[in-house]
Amino acid sequence: MQVQGFFDRLTGRNKEAWKEGRIRGTAVLVKKDVLGLGDFHASLLDGVHNILGHKEGVAFRLVSATARDPSNGGRGKLGKPAHLEELVVTMKSTAAGESVFRVAFEWDESQGIPGAVVVTNSNRSEFFLKTLTLDGVPGKGTVVFVANSWIYPADNYQYERVFFANDTYLPSKMPAPLIPYRQEELNILRGDGKIGPYKEHDRIYRYDYYNDLGQPDKGSKLVRPVLGGSQELPYPRRGRTGRAPTKTDPNTESRLPLLDLNIYVPRDERFGHLKMSDFLGYSLKAIVEGVLPIIRTYVDTTPKEFDSFQDIMELYEGGLKVANASALAEIKKRVPFELIKSLLPVAGDQVLKLPLPHVIKEDKFAWRTDEEFAREMLAGVNPVMIKRLTNFPAKSTLDPNVYGDHTSKITEAHIKHNMEGLTVQNALKGNRLFILDHHDHFMPFLDKINKLDGNFIYASRTILLLKDDGTLKPLAIELSLPHPDGQQHGAVSKVYTPANTGVESQIWQLAKAYASVNDSAWHQLISHWLNTHAVIEPFVIATNRQLSVVHPVHKLLSPHYRDTMNINALARQTLINADGIFEKTVFPGKYALEMSSVVYKNWKFTEQALPVDLVKRGVAVPDPTSPYNVRLLIKDYPYAVDGLVIWWAIERWVGEYLAIYYPNDGVLRGDEELQAWWKEVREVGHGDLKDQDWWPKMDTVQELTRACTIIIWIASALHAAVNFGQYPYAGFLPNRPTVSRRPMPEPGTEEYAKLERGGDEADLVFIHTITSQFQTILGISLIEILSKHSSDEVYLGQRDTPEWTSDAKALDAFKRFGSRLVDIENRIKDMNGNSALKNRNGPVKMPYMLLYPNTSDVTKEKGQGLTAMGIPNSISI
């Protein structure tokens, strides 16, 4: 009673009966501090003080969806302002920091049914409004306004903050009194004509080129080309920040200081969902300010190489010990030590101790087997590259007039003894030969790349045989370099084949490592960054600019955009920037993003559909009798098997949902917002490819269903498949090295003699050939963070707000989607327990769970942290 009395006095009122002509409501707000790195469990009284300010500090005015005001241009009638009243003290579970307030509105039936609310913040600080719920609305019952938005003091805006009820309307179906509000809100978000620089409170979605990666004002070494806006270096667009150009180059945007993570994204795109998500930016900052000095302190007091595999294991079993106490003290001053402690557990003087990667948890040596090397092409962190070999020897797509002949040097003589009784021609006809081909990817860049300090990179081809038991075995690896007399002369190549004993077995291990270096770089640069993060951002921007929040397609896609603009902005600031962590740890170095631009020239939106991709790579063939319309040629291909059923579930959900609003193609063609959205995606967001003939015309519901399925697939399942296995597979870097620094040892050299002697000496040759000690520690410190699920993760088949729509048909369809995903979870667990499916676990005994939806984990208890499982809705890390 004392607490209630405090609130009564604070709000200047006592509890009183609800009067006639009033609508009761509850508003859920979150104070500013809770979504930062302060006290996550701020006290209730602090929450009231920070949110309420004074009793009229937050005002709500309802807008009628059915009654027009002739004196206000026919807009919906506006109700009188209502203010936050007493805070609801409840023992029910509310998220940390949430406060629930009562609100009472003067409203009668003559004003019709509320369809929007205008919110005004007269306080000094912003707050986060989650929802406003009205009960007992005449003629309607319950009305829910889902805001999920930061509301700043009113003097920051030149417009009113308007939120719509959770009803869904095509533009032609929008209640007339609300149409002006719908149009004005879209104009505000477009911000056309507002060049910036944009402020923290801004909500502007505009496009820009990738022109903010370099720092020409700091010298030529930090100059990077502008990506996007040209045929030479095309690229998807990113969100505009409005920052000024550099002094040296007017085409390059100036950058914030490295450790300033307040790079502009529209306010509601910023991490505001707390805990691990919001913590990510600070973790990256901790790496730069905390981990780098620790690593340098460590490597400066020891040789700059690991001395053995046990030396590497010490990262997980013993940790790094910092001998220089003063250096550690300085680090503690520069970064709040709690951050480093949370990021990297501290035990005594063991400052950096990393969790044991899944790939070596059960067996420390199984990663070295040929079986595991091949299996990871089907169930590893980059399972999207393997292709069926259709010609032997393998052909090149490089222009022979420029590059000469790059036909593979692998001959039948190299592999016939290992073909399990098959001839090459029989194996080709029987769909038994496959290839991991990075030759053409890297060859045009190798001259430049190998001039970078510390690099000796080959372009690789790996040929594999599909065995009778459904597993793959490598037959040969071809390593190639540009011809010393010029690229027009083709390549200088050497072929290596499997061996189990002697120096040949050591050479074979190195050959696999060189091939893995290629695959690691391609994975990070193309499979991960370009094909998920970069290509999705234009859809995020276009959706917010052209589709109202009440549009059915906006409601369908918005969960799959959560945090994407923010993580991409942080990537530009600290990861893919000039001399950033990516350039420090992966071999293409400063040419990395330029390479990804060349690859983007051949990107096709329609080929991102999983069934299309599998057929294109030759690992599946069309089959109209299959529910997925394709049949896999590698039956035990975990990524494809799980991916196809996930794809099917997404496509079915999207089809059922869109059918509610688009009963025929004519309705779709007449949807002006949808048509403007697709036009902008094609002509602006992916504008460098706008003239390609593969773009869907967006004339049919089928085209929209396929397009939305592709968008959701990329943002959820594809990203999960290539992201959350990073630390589990590559956290032990010998399994997935990112750099090779020395050529393959040749007979007569000291390195070759060490390989002949075997044992520790041979191990050292391997260790000193791959990623350096500094690069290893920095790289795996980063991917540990990037492989973690946040504590507030929202998985496929879940929504962060249960009241995301008022449409019962849509809610029922979504429930069916969730049920299908839970069935898929059980199916995946059953397959992982089937010993006949050898690729599901492999020699390392690591079940393939990267496409396990984790929809059933509503408490988020199973899915938090480094789990190597779960499909989040969006690219949020």
UniProtKB/Swiss-Prot annotation:
Q: Highest taxon of the source? A: Eukaryota
Tell me the leader sequence span. none
Q: Name one GO molecular function term.
A: oxidoreductase activity, acting on single donors with incorporation of molecular oxygen, incorporation of two atoms of oxygen
- Domain PLAT spans what residues? 38-165
InterPro entries per the UniProt record, alphabetical: LipOase (IPR000907), LipOase_C (IPR013819), LipOase_C_sf (IPR036226), LipOase_CS (IPR020834), LipOase_Fe_BS (IPR020833), LipOase_plant (IPR001246), Lipoxy_PLAT/LH2 (IPR042057), Lipoxygenase_dom_3 (IPR027433)
Residues the entry annotates as binding Fe cation: 528, 533, 719, 723, 877
Give the cofactor binding note: Binds 1 Fe cation per subunit. Iron is tightly bound.
Q: In which pathway does it act?
A: Lipid metabolism; oxylipin biosynthesis
Q: Which reaction does it catalyse?
A: (9Z,12Z)-octadecadienoate + O2 = (9S)-hydroperoxy-(10E,12Z)-octadecadienoate
Protein function:
Plant lipoxygenase may be involved in a number of diverse aspects of plant physiology including growth and development, pest resistance, and senescence or responses to wounding. Catalyzes the hydroperoxidation of lipids containing a cis,cis-1,4-pentadiene structure.
Family of the protein in this entry: Belongs to the lipoxygenase family.
The protein, known as = Probable linoleate 9S-lipoxygenase 4
Provide the organism lineage as a comma list: Eukaryota, Viridiplantae, Streptophyta, Embryophyta, Tracheophyta
